[in-house]
Amino acid sequence: MCGIFGYLGNQDGVSIVLEGLAKLEYRGYDSAGLAAVVEQELFIRKTVGRVQELSNLFQEREIPTASVIGHTRWATHGVPTEINAHPHVDEGRSCAVVHNGIIENFKELRRELTAQGISFASDTDSEIIVQLFSLYYQESQDLVFSFCQTLAQLRGSVACALIHKDHPHTILCASQESPLILGLGKEETFIASDSRAFFKYTRHSQALASGEFAIVSQGKEPEVYNLELKKIHKDVRQITCSEDASDKSGYGYYMLKEIYDQPEVLEGLIQKHMDEEGHILSEFLSDVPIKSFKEITIVACGSSYHAGYLAKYIIESLVSIPVHIEVASEFRYRRPYIGKDTLGILISQSGETADTLAALKELRRRNIAYLLGICNVPESAIALGVDHCLFLEAGVEIGVATTKAFTSQLLLLVFLGLKLANVHGALTHAEQCSFGQGLQSLPDLCQKLLANESLHSWAQPYSYEDKFLFLGRRLMYPVVMEAALKLKEIAYIEANAYPGGEMKHGPIALISKGTPVIAFCGDDIVYEKMIGNMMEVKARHAHVIAIAPESREDIAAVSDQQIFVPDCHFLAAPVLYTIVGQVMAYAMALAKGMEIDCPRNLAKSVTVE
């Protein structure tokens, strides 16, 4: 989950690359570095820490060079040190590489190269690329052949960019199970893990498909090849981006801004996919044979898995179609049953999640009837690899802990459930109107909720706690799974989520005097059951914080503290209560003085398995 940025052109390449790397820090921020060819010698600078630390190394950034490659790292092989930071160079310092991914056969290749007398400077798998390329180039003196031969030896995920000191006007780059995008400017080319990193300079792009590499030369269009050295024609795509992602709009953190973006984002989805009366528009999934599916399999990771889990509950409550939810990293190794009339749904905010992409390939291999993607990036691998893709329309999300992208996923999945129910005749006209109107009220309810000061003030008295239990039932269970994950991600607190009814089957043994238990009581069908679960933990002297509808003032009798949520339709409740969990986690991280936007050990886009 590293970020790559390269530049070839006539401008100040070092400044442009540093700026691009700063926009890619969501992919990793353990260390950073860059390489350039200056007067036929490699110029290398790298450091442990953030891109700003790298920028501080340049008193005068204006360096006479046409080609620069840079990298911001999230460590997978080798601890974060300056030696392990990218770029890596060969023994003779003739070439340098930056790499995102994991080379699965690196130990085998390292043994072979070591046996040939090659010494390695780092502990990383990435150094294999540059040492192997250098060996081939010494023998052939052919850039393209040597690069192709190198790539053919690598198993795993590889996005990389490579420069050679004897070819100062050329950058070699490749994609293999890891994203890499070319940005096409006027007499300049950009190379990046994410097109938004060069959006300021050009909106014209070409995405390398897996198994393709490009020769980027100054003054020429990039030449793209496959590993059989067949030249590939690539269409130029127009990048669309609706906002300046670097603007926090006065908020202290991107995460907080993105939390408060949600009413507007949800309003946009509602206006796009619903009519004024609250009906799902006929154009929604109109080209998908939605009535033909007998079952649904959802595959996702992390927060997207929680969204899929909620979709299972909602869809099965609306229409008689079985829904299976799978963790992507387990799915491809488990060989679950896939019926011939199965709809596969792949959920990924970035559209580049490695395990979810692997599941996509496995589902294709299993001849699944249809694949639907749900993601935020139109040019992503998942968006391009499915039969139809629903886009989150959430805008750029920079905070590592997802907020607005997650609630957009929830709303689109609710729309999917309503569409399925409609085509199967499972809802009366009155139900359709009621459900639609309940969803249309969401943006206003979100605004009202976010004005509730108790969401922020709750955290300080609990900032010394090192563990929390979250309880929820039915639709609230996936919501508390997400809330607990948020507390782990940005406040570094051990937080576990359980269905309320499971407490007496083991987890209640964790309760001691003062243990904080957060109970989400936003599902009317199981409200009384949740009251019983809260009384169980209260009897063991837990400190209970109840998250409940504002009309349920009686909940004060069985809880120590209450946070009230506007009354809403049951389909809107998961979104509102999810936002409660987001703000509570943010408030706790703030109270503990944590780095909220860039939590330790995490990256925004998980592009390695």
Curated annotation (Swiss-Prot):
Enzymatic class: transferase
Record keywords, A-Z: Aminotransferase, Cytoplasm, Glutamine amidotransferase, Repeat, Transferase
Chemical reaction(s) catalysed: D-fructose 6-phosphate + L-glutamine = D-glucosamine 6-phosphate + L-glutamate
Active-site residues (renumbered): C2, K604
Enzyme Commission number, as recorded: 2.6.1.16
Coiled coil: none
Role played: Catalyzes the first step in hexosamine metabolism, converting fructose-6P into glucosamine-6P using glutamine as a nitrogen source.
Subunit structure: Homodimer.
Record protein name field: Glutamine--fructose-6-phosphate aminotransferase [isomerizing]
Upper taxonomic lineage: Bacteria, Pseudomonadati, Chlamydiota, Chlamydiia, Chlamydiales
